[in-house]
Amino acid sequence: MKKIILSVFVLVLTIVLTSCGADEKTIVVGATPSPHAEILNSDAVKNYIESKGYKLEVKVYQDYVTPNKALNDGGIDANYFQHIPYLETEVAEKNYDIVAACQVHNEPLNLYGLDEKTSWDNTKVYIINDASNVERAFKLLVANGLIDSYSVEDFNAQRPEYTSSIGVTIECIDAGLLHNKVSEGGYAVIPGNYALTAWGATKASEYKIFGESTDVAYPNIIAVRTSDVDSDKIKVLIEALSQPEVKKFIEDNYGPTVNYVFKDLK
């Protein structure tokens, strides 16, 4: 009986230790579908990570809220979906202990529509309703003459403050709903990843009317827990994303919709 109990104990201990070892060699990254998860799942990234003795697991999220919570709570090792202003807002509001480890690419914010208008008078334009992106949308609309001025102090998505001498009206809605307005014949300022997920790179380019310049667009980052920023896992992940094969993958698959701008931020 003692031998049986001992054998069972040894078996359980072996399973536990094996599981721990596997976890130490598995890098779990949360990402939104396109282009983030697609980039991570590319051979360019996965082959490099495997060459260093690690395995990459990508968890796909459909929203902007869950990935930071999962990271802060320890459910994933890193996430890839956001830019630094959004991360800073999340950290300030929710007291998350997470930081940017590297920047990878940017996605210029663009105005999309099925047809380009000859006059924007009295047009309704839909924009994203989160505070970190709404100013980008306003700046884009000012630069192209649709609105004259705006204010983002004490931003309220229900009552955005702006003026337009040509009667343009603005409505703030969830990012995931913006592409529907375009499909219905309307106009919307949409983050690049949502446009890619909705239409793919080719259609997104066709529907684009105007957009940010690449030097204005905010870089999308890899975020990690502060305590893990110098861990071996994160070092390998950053190294993988810095490879020239990743740059080529982005250029080949997304064209001007996504721009490779890698920089180590540690």
Task: Give residue spans per PLM region.
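Short, polar/charged alpha-helical segment
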Residues: 34-57
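C-terminal motif of bacterial Sec signal peptides marking the signal peptidase cleavage site
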Residues: 15-19
